[in-house]
Amino acid sequence: MRSSSTLLIAFGLFLASMSVEAIIRPGYGSGGHRPPSSYHGGHHNDDDCTTKPPKSTSTPSTSTSTPTTTTTTTTTTTTTPTTTTTTTTTTTPEPTTTKVKVCPQGYTSFLRTPAADNSFTSEWCMQLIWSPRQPMPINNASALCQASNTEAVVTTFANEEELNVFSLQMAQQFDRVGPATRGAIAVDGRRIAACVSRDRGILDSEECNGTNSFVMVDKHTSPGFTWSKWATNEPSANAWTYDIEQCIQFTVYPALTGPGDNPYNMLNRNNKFNDIYCNMDKAPNEPTNTAYWNFGALCGVLPS
C-alpha cells in the first residue's frame, strides 16, 4: 500500500506541476509561443520557438598569387664627343703710318698752350729771316716770310722762352755781322683802323689807349705776352707828315758802344716792343739810330 500511495502522491505532484506550467506558459495554439522541443522531451525542429541562425556555408577562399614581373629598362646614353676645330687666321695688319708733323727746314718748333686766343695752337714753327735790304720797311716783312715758305706769316713771341731764343740770335748777328750793334726786327701787330688818327683825343681815349689800339694779324699767337713787353712810354702813336706809327718792331739793345749812346735807350728798349712806321725803313726823327732800323722779320708757320 505504501508503494501505491507513493505512486499516487508522485502522480499528483506531476499533475500539479503541469497545471502550474500551463498557467505560466500559454499554449501555442492560441497564438502563444510554441514550447521548445526540450519541453516535450523531444528534438523536433518544428517545436522549437527559437529561430535558429541560418547555417553558414563557408567556401574556402583560394588565394592565387600571380607573380609580378618587374621589367627594368636600362637606358644607355651614348655621348658623342664634340670635336671643336679651331681655325687660326693670321691677319697681317696693314702698316699704319702716322705722319709726324715737322717744321719746314730752317724753322724751329715751339710748344704752346692751346687757347682760344691762339686758335688752340699747340705747336708753332718760327724762324728769324734777315732781310737782304737793310734796313727795310715793315710792310716788306710779309713777302720776306713767304719767300721762305708760302704758308709763313709775320709772327711774334708767345712767351719768354721764344723771346730769349731770338733775342740771342739777334745779338749774335749784330756782333758778328753788323752793320750795327743794336737793331730791330718786324713782328706781328697792327693798330686798329679806328685808332689810326692824328687826333690826340682819339689816340688817348680808352678805346685807343696803349695796348687797346693794337691787334694781332695772325691768330696763332696769344697777344698777352707782347702787350706786357712794351718799351717805356710805348706805344706812343707818333705821327710824321703823312704817316703814323701803326706797326710793331722788337728791339735788341745789348750794350752801350760809344760815348754818344743813351743809357736810357739801352735799359728801356732792350728786348722790348715799340710801335713804328710801317712804310719807313728808318725813324724820320732819328734816322741814324739803328735801334729803330728793321733788319729782318720774325716768321711763323704750322708744322706739316
From Swiss-Prot:
Keywords: Signal. It comes from the Eukaryota. Residues 51-99 have a biased composition (Low complexity). Residues 1-19 form the signal peptide. This is C-type lectin domain-containing protein 141. Disulfide bonds: none annotated. Residues 29-100 are annotated as: Disordered. Coiled coil: none annotated.
